[in-house]
């Protein structure tokens, strides 16, 4: 796919598609609650559609009229053994969290995914689930998908210190703990996104969170709710960076989720000197309007406890750093290696091919800016965030063409990305 280059400016306002993390969890909690849950502004990207189909395969009736999704919840006890293998597509969120849901189910399941998902290690979930009494096996000693699993109606509670900062692993263990006999304690390495904890309380459940320690009792039931999904800050991130680095730009993003565990990119932009403003802040919905405009930027250091708050935004932050004066150092981000691709290597290769100066490290990157970018051929390797990062980078290219291979990966999280880009180019 040939990408748009030589942008003269991006102007206009956008309403960002629904948050992917919250969309997944809305389907899960709606399915596990009693009654009919309605979800508005859900993201209809491929990952979320995978989760929706899996719960249908587990016996849940889910209606989608294109406006509102209605989930006829069955509770933990109402899930049925699937007739076929469960297809998780490209979605690490789906396979990890649903492993936790199925941990307390006394039936056989097999979960599989696409080529990319089949390379992602699941041992960080399977090891603690085995301790709780689940029979589960995968491929190689890292338990790559497909996973075969048989849950237990007498799950043991667990005391578990997470070896990595991972909201997916934490959430999988929370779903399992909700079905265990007694109280479980989960201790995070670093604070990660807390949508699962928030939604437990929204759906009438209980848990205690003190610092990095989560206590949760089994045997809880949930009640159906009305959910409105805010815009996804991980999708908004591409426009935040575009508005900062493309000359003559001003972009207004409406209804963006600003959950405090997800706003690391806003902190980084401020640290780099970017012009960014939040308005219309809704403390209940945790959303705001965010405005950015073309800025002179300086390099910065990114590491430590901010990393889980921007882990998915690091590819586009790397592009931002190529357009800042001086060095930017990203560290403590080894988790990038086990995303849809090895994002440290793939991001560096893609942007270096376009003229950037990026040195990959064991746990991050060293980026030296400011560098002009030129045309190149870039492959997403099936990673949606690489695709969108490259499309924004292409806007800065003055010399040559940018040819993006496997651009369809973007549909994983942002099916309307290119139409939104067109709107801003002609805004």
Swiss-Prot record:
It is found in: Cytoplasm. GO terms for cellular component: cytoplasm. 3-phosphoshikimate binds at residues 20-21, 25, 166, 168, 312, 339. Coiled coil: none annotated. Pathway: Metabolic intermediate biosynthesis; chorismate biosynthesis; chorismate from D-erythrose 4-phosphate and phosphoenolpyruvate: step 6/7. One of its GO terms (biological process) is chorismate biosynthetic process. The keyword Cytoplasm applies. Phosphoenolpyruvate binds at residues 20, 92, 120, 168, 343, 385. It catalyses: 3-phosphoshikimate + phosphoenolpyruvate = 5-O-(1-carboxyvinyl)-3-phosphoshikimate + phosphate. Disulfide bonds: none annotated. CDD domains: EPSP_synthase (cd01556). Catalyzes the transfer of the enolpyruvyl moiety of phosphoenolpyruvate (PEP) to the 5-hydroxyl of shikimate-3-phosphate (S3P) to produce enolpyruvyl shikimate-3-phosphate and inorganic phosphate. Belongs to the EPSP synthase family. HAMAP family: EPSP_synth. Monomer. This is 3-phosphoshikimate 1-carboxyvinyltransferase. It comes from Streptococcus thermophilus (strain ATCC BAA-491 / LMD-9).
């Amino acid at each position: 796919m040939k990408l748009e280059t030589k942008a003269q400016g991006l102007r206009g306002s956008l309403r960002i598609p629904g948050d992917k993390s919250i969309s997944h969890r809305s389907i899960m909690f709606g399915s596990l609650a009693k009654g009919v849950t309605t979800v508005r502004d859900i993201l209809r990207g491929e990952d979320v559609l995978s989760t929706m189909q899996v719960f249908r395969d587990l016996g849940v009736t889910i209606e989608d009229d294109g406006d509102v999704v209605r989930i006829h919840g069955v509770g933990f006890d109402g899930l049925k053994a699937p007739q076929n293998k469960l297809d998780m597509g490209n979605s690490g969120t789906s396979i990890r969290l649903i492993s936790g849901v199925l941990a307390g189910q006394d039936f056989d399941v097999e979960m599989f995914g696409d080529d990319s998902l089949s390379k992602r290690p699941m041992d960080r979930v399977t090891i603690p689930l085995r301790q709780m009494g689940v029979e589960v096996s995968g491929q190689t000693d890292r338990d790559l998908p497909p996973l075969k699993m048989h849950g237990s109606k007498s799950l043991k509670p667990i005391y578990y210190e997470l070896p990595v900062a991972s909201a997916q692993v934490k959430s999988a263990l929370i779903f399992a703990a909700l079905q265990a006999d007694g109280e479980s304690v989960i201790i995070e390495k670093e604070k990660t996104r807390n949508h699962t904890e928030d939604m437990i309380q929204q759906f009438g459940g209980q848990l205690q969170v003190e610092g990095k320690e989560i206590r949760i009792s089994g045997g809880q039931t949930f009640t159906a709710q009305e959910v409105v999904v805010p815009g996804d800050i991980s999708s908004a991130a591409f426009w935040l960076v575009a508005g900062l680095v493309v000359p003559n730009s001003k972009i207004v993003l409406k209804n963006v989720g600003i959950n405090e565990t997800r706003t690391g990119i806003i902190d980084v932009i401020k640290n780099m000197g970017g012009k960014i403003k939040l308005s219309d802040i809704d403390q209940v919905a945790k959303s705001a309007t965010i405005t950015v405009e073309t800025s002179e930027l300086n390099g910065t250091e990114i590491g430590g406890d901010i990393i889980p708050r921007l882990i998915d935004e690091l590819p586009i932050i790397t592009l931002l750093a190529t357009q800042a004066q001086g060095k930017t150092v990203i560290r403590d981000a080894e988790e990038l290696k086990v995303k849809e691709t090895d994002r440290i290597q793939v991001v560096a290769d893609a942007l270096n091919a376009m003229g950037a100066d990026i040195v990959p490290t064991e746990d991050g990157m060293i980026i030296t800016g400011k560098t002009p970018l030129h045309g190149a051929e870039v492959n997403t390797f099936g990673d949606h965030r690489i695709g969108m990062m490259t499309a924004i980078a292409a806007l800065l290219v003055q010399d040559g063409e940018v040819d993006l291979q496997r651009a369809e990966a973007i549909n994983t999280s942002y099916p309307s990305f290119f139409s939104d880009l067109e709107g801003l180019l002609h805004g």
